[in-house]
Amino acid sequence: SDLEDGHGKEYPVEGMPVSTNPSGTGYVDYVLWGRDGKPLAVVEAKKTMVEARAGKHQATLYADCLEAMHGQRPIIFYSNGFETFLWDDTFYPEREVYGFFREDELQRMVDRRANRKDLKAFEVDRNISGRPYQLEAIQRVAETLVKEREGQLRGGQRECLLVMATGSGKTRTSAAIVDMLTKCNWAKRVLFLADRTSLVAQAKSAFNEHLPELSAIDLTKEKEDPSTRLVFSTYPTMMNKIDGAKVDGERMYGAGHFDLIIIDEAHRSVYQKYRAIFEYFDCLL
């Protein structure tokens, strides 16, 4: 629901601990609803003078109540206007994010709970990437991204760095990683960043060859389409897309639009110069 029109504001929930509220009723600052009428996210808003994390416990209690009432656990947000934290407590620890997610981005996160598969068990397509060191690199990525807790599949680290020599098949390896993440339902949309248009074009061509079933665009030449699965871009082009707005004033890409960013040649200078991209998008890196 839109925060602007007041939908979801001060939503009453039942089942709060009596120690918190003798009546057992609580009032959630905001609930963001899915089209099926189930809660996608709960937002606990704190005053700017108060730390955002001060809302974590309260937001968790509200999520418990909403889950009991509607049969779906919402994504948890708490914010003071300066800092915003997201917590999908069924899978990941809390993390700071740029802002709130759009409805389709939240729905994707909730749906993923039921259909996400263990990356460590994935059989890599050796037609894409079959050299022993490539397979080991892919396996290490899987082991880094996945963590098990009490026999349950959970998310591990969200960032990986592969150090590979020129000619060792970096693009093939990254294509195989994308194949793994998409087929295991960890990623739907992927952003590939390079510092030159020629590298962007080469990468798109290679991914089209190895993953022809995934739609792809070169953002330096083609008009963006939000439904595209693979987006290839230079850093400045993507910076402009983040800073600019569509005709209706909304940004082209929400903070949760991409599930994975691949950086070609991840130098420290690149990260420092274009860190706004990585701070804006909440995704695997």
Region roles according to the model:
Residues 219-231, 252:
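Conserved motor-coupling elements within RecA-like helicase/translocase cores
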Residues 240-242, 280:
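Short, solvent-exposed loop/turn elements at domain surfaces
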Residues 249-284:
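SF2 helicase catalytic motif II
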Residues 1-189, 194, 198-214, 226-230, ...:
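ATP-dependent helicase/translocase motor core
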Residues 76, 231, 261, 284-285:
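Short, well-ordered beta-strand core segments
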